[in-house]
């Protein structure tokens, strides 16, 4: 009798999954919060696309453009529930993500190329350039703190936006790893007018940042005024030492 109940329950579960898979994508888009705007969706909840998607960040809209998605129902248990691909002009984002039963957010195999200008919607940083990120793994705890982060971020054609005109900085790479001491990263200069070397660390909610700045851009008056509250002068340029909690 127990085997019969098991097969009945399994059949019911499979039927529910198949029924869900056939639901149109428009059903899913109607369940999204107001901070996500979707137009012209097609396909199914299981695998579909939207002609244009934008999300609200700090009261401003960030365009994702065309978005395609594919659900992985068996990946829900391990935090790999969906693959998302978006394209908006030269901007593209490919990512696999999910939420574990414990509430941890997991991101893997993320490839991102975008104009870094969107950072200004989150932080008061007047910067420009192109951001390329290859994130192997990112885990964010249920409390919202990063627990694991591995990957590489490249900031190309970096510039500081000043009233008198942009200050060209260069191209920089950040290599990020995670071990028992927490998340750590190293910043290196590939080329440019600002020589930047540094490192950062994050464990729990405690962070530290240390960096040295030198080169022609470090002698630019507008740039010096911009970093005056963060950096102290040295013989070769400037030094930044920050620490605190998120």
Where are these regions (language model features)?
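Outer-membrane beta-barrel architecture
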Residues: 146-150, 208
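Short beta-strand or tight-loop elements
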Residues: 34, 46, 194
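Extended terminal
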Residues: 2-10, 29-31, 165-167, 171-246
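Flexible, membrane-facing loop/turn or short amphipathic-helix motifs
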Residues: 52-63, 90-97, 112-125, 137-145, ...
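Membrane-embedded beta-strand positions in outer-membrane beta-barrel channels/transporters
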Residues: 94, 130-132, 137, 173, ...
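N-terminal beta-strand/beta-hairpin edge segment
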Residues: 38-125, 130-132
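Aromatic-capped interface at the extracytoplasmic side
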Residues: 15-40
């Amino acid at each position: 009798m127990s085997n019969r109940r098991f097969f009945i329950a399994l059949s019911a579960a499979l039927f529910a999954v198949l029924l869900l898979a056939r639901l149109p994508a428009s059903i899913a888009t109607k369940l999204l919060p107001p901070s996500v705007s979707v137009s012209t969706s097609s396909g199914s909840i299981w695998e579909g696309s939207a002609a244009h998607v934008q999300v609200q960040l700090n009261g401003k809209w960030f365009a994702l453009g065309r978005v395609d998605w594919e659900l992985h129902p068996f990946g829900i248990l391990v935090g790999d529930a969906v693959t998302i691909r978006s394209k908006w002009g030269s901007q593209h984002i490919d990512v696999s993500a999910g939420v574990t039963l414990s509430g941890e957010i997991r991101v893997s195999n993320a490839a991102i190329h975008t104009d870094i200008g969107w950072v200004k919607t989150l932080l008061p940083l007047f910067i420009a350039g192109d951001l390329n990120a290859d994130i192997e793994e990112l885990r964010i705890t249920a409390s919202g703190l990063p627990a694991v982060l591995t990957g590489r971020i490249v900031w190309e054609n970096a510039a500081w936006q000043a009233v008198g005109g942009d200050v060209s900085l260069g191209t920089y790479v950040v290599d990020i790893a995670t071990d028992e001491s927490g998340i750590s990263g190293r910043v290196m200069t590939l080329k440019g007018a600002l020589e930047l070397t540094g490192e950062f660390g994050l464990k729990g909610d405690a962070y530290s940042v240390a960096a040295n700045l030198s080169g022609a851009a470090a002698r630019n008056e507008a740039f010096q005024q911009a970093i005056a509250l963060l950096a102290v002068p040295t013989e070769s340029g400037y030094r930044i030492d920050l620490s605190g909690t998120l």
